[in-house]
Amino acid sequence: SALWMAAGFLWILDASINISMEPFRSLVADKLPESQRSYGFVVQTLIIGIGTWVASNLPWFVTLLGAKNEAAPGEIPESVFYAFAIGAFVFISSILFTVFKTSEAPPEDMDEFLSNKKKNSGLLFGVKEIYENILGMPKVMKQLGVVQFFSWFAFFTMWSSATPALTGSVFGAPYPASDAVNFDVLNSAYNEAANAVSSSMGVYGLSSMAFALVLTFYTSRLQINRKIIHSLSLAAGGVGFIWMLFLSPESSNNLKWCFALIGISWGSILSMPYAILSDKIPKEKMGVYMGIFNMFIVFPQIIAALGGINWLTSQLGNTFLGIQLINSMVLAGICLLLGSIITLFIKEKSFS
């Protein structure tokens, strides 16, 4: 069906973005000395924050340029189509630019490198190496993996559920039934609310950018306790998500503040775990361990997409809050708060 096809393409999109981004995290760790890695990951987060804000506002921007914001039932509005098309072009262009413009330092002993590459080639060896590295993961990587699970489950919940949850709960304009008598009026109100949600979501990109700027300034001059910063950042995002439960059409302006808090956690998620991890793994295994670490990003999103969000949200509603779409945002907040608590138990001996 069309729904399953859309879900399938969403998974492919998510997987391709994660796979293409992973080598760049390893590249940051490879190119920078240990003392500057926190700084490098934070700068990367700053750039991601700028992109997040621009992307979140693309539907609104192309609407101003004349793209239609409404569509018949079962069709995609022009504003959404053009926003995704622009995003695809920028994504491919930035990947190609980085690939062709970034140099990598050659191995110190090229002959030894080529010899080892020849000995260790083949699919079976690659599978065996990954399996052995998974079994031998450093303890801090396992601990961070649990934190990453809750963090990325929360954000996938936001990406997939924020619009239907917030248009109805905060703006009082849920998506209308196709057989509604005044469908056109209700659909127009829904699309306006959806644009407002998208614009508000752009704030989390701005706040993550501002947070990254502060961290960039701070980490370039002083040592930081990355564990505490990450824990507090996740807690801020958790509060932002749960705050949404108490918003109404009269207080909808506060939605931007909710996303501002969420942006703080987003800025930390994209930098602090990698900065912590890069100090604990051998440089020669940086790529494979960063790849394995990426599994802790992909798995929660797969579980969420396959029904984890719906099941947990229904359990939360049946037990505490009653059945309502906004419960998905509360679930995201609970996940970030759990991640915040678990972060405090990570053993980090050094700072950078």
Region roles according to the model:
Residues S1, A235-P249:
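C-terminal ends and interior cores of transmembrane alpha-helices
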Residues S1-S20, N253-I269:
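Hydrophobic core of transmembrane alpha-helices in multi-pass small-molecule transporters
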Residues A2-W11, I17-S20, F24-R25, K31-T157, ...:
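Intracellular loop-helix junctions on the cytosolic face of multi-pass helical membrane proteins
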Residues I19-L32, S268-P282:
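Intracellular juxtamembrane helix-capping segments at the cytosolic ends
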Residues E34-Q44, A194, I281-F293:
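Loop-to-transmembrane helix entry/capping segments in MFS-fold secondary transporters
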Residues V42, G172-L206, N254, N327:
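Loop-to-transmembrane helix entry
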Residues A210-N225:
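Helix-to-loop junctions at the C-terminal end of transmembrane segments
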Residues K283-Q315:
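A late C-terminal transmembrane helix in Major Facilitator Superfamily
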